[in-house]
Swiss-Prot record:
The record marks 428 as: Transition state stabilizer. The lineage of its organism: Eukaryota, Viridiplantae, Streptophyta, Embryophyta, Tracheophyta. It comes from Arabidopsis thaliana (Mouse-ear cress). It is found in: Membrane. One of its GO terms (biological process) is cell wall modification. Residues 55-102 are annotated as: Disordered. The PMEI region may act as an autoinhibitory domain and prevent untimely PME activity during transport. Pathway: Glycan metabolism; pectin degradation; 2-dehydro-3-deoxy-D-gluconate from pectin: step 1/5. Residues 103-255 are annotated as: Pectinesterase inhibitor 13. This is Probable pectinesterase/pectinesterase inhibitor 13.
Amino acid sequence: MAFQDFDKIQERVNANRKRKFRKRIIVGTVSLLVVVAAIVGGAFAYVAYEKRNEQQQQQQQAKNHNKSGSGNNVVKDSDKKSPSPPTPSQKAPVSAAQSVKPGQGDKIIQTLCSSTLYMQICEKTLKNRTDKGFALDNPTTFLKSAIEAVNEDLDLVLEKVLSLKTENQDDKDAIEQCKLLVEDAKEETVASLNKINVTEVNSFEKVVPDLESWLSAVMSYQETCLDGFEEGNLKSEVKTSVNSSQVLTSNSLALIKTFTENLSPVMKVVERHLLDDIPSWVSNDDRRMLRAVDVKALKPNATVAKDGSGDFTTINDALRAMPEKYEGRYIIYVKQGIYDEYVTVDKKKANLTMVGDGSQKTIVTGNKSHAKKIRTFLTATFVAQGEGFMAQSMGFRNTAGPEGHQAVAIRVQSDRSIFLNCRFEGYQDTLYAYTHRQYYRSCVIVGTIDFIFGDAAAIFQNCNIFIRKGLPGQKNTVTAQGRVDKFQTTGFVVHNCKIAANEDLKPVKEEYKSYLGRPWKNYSRTIIMESKIENVIDPVGWLRWQETDFAIDTLYYAEYNNKGSSGDTTSRVKWPGFKVINKEEALNYTVGPFLQGDWISASGSPVKLGLYDA
């Protein structure tokens, strides 16, 4: 072994020590807050006492370390340093009602903010609120304060966007789109605040998946707002405002992660992906619906048929007739036929199920495209926004062809959405898995460039993914995941799927290089595991974004236990962000932990919560 290898090992050892030290300090800080909260009673007093002993040991270690002449600063990035982690008060709590000592609030803020990417802004945000009388009584009040700052900043973004003046129609469209997206973002932050307001500290971990999903969506909405503007003065004006709210959102997500990691050992909360209770949003009707084979057994609320044999002849007419308030799941049965219409299931239409006669029998089709000067975001044939949307045995198409360039068949931003035995056909940008938690089972997805893209937390399980023939000279990419921040809980997981050439590509596949994906945004995250990858995929596996080094250090691309002629990872890219993972790491991206998949299994949909080789 070379001498420089010993140096690298020592650097890693030192870095691990620093990380462990900081984690212990944060654990102690959060434990102290929990005790002060007066919610958890005497059990937490004992835990805090144990933490106090651990903190005293760490404090003594820190003193000894400083005497030796080296500091205990933690380096987060090459150009960004955090101050030495402060040590919370060592005095054990005498009672649960005890208040925090003067000056201790600042130390706690510093400690909690040390886990964020934008530490100084985090400290300033929380400090400003404590100065205004913000109560330092439990961990969730810190988080609430951080999210309130996001919500207030979004008001400023909206104010800025509405003040913009232009005569250019493209810019006007971008302004209108951004306005709607900022309003969507505000809805998510308000929902997050409402959730925190009704949650006790000892139940906090149960609501974390919702908070992470909603705030991750806020990040996506902010980014899409910016993407809508062409480069120029107008975009620069908006970018300054939007970037500010993105920073605050990132800090909120980081604080959630900090509290989750450090409340778990304190409170022994049940693992969120192994809940014993069936979630309240899943009804018995949902389970019967997804288990049903005969559509007549569904007892739909409305039937759509082009031949007039149903209640409506168009899907949109059926949606307009759906009651504004409906208890339980509302089912629309769409009979065989090609429905040439643009459909939006808006946010008010929650818990809606659409069932067709088959993915190649009941088809919703359109042909909007970027080539027709339509924004990619608005080209979707079908849009699913309402929470809890389910589709079974349906087909979704965009027939713009390869000449249409970006042309979306479906855009999904419905939280806890399920697609079972569905088919998605297009070329570039076929399936826009935009935001929130999504599950696709036994589906067929067909396209050319970035044909599964977006910033959702989405798992594709037991699906057939077919790469088709595009324009001459084009390179095909299956995925283009758009995670913009390391604390977002989003990403794509392709699990036990088949990736192969479509029939039209097979004879000429040597003329079209195809790849598993490319990084659309800085923290793009895609995992391909336990899948069959046929020889349509280039041995390097992954493609750079427009032949640059963009995101190759910050992305997370992983493969685990794949098979097929292109499943061999020997010749894969040598990027810092790509890795071949082991079983332990792969488990993190199964349905259970990644989507908190109890809601899927409770719905009656077939699902594999863990690995197939377990």
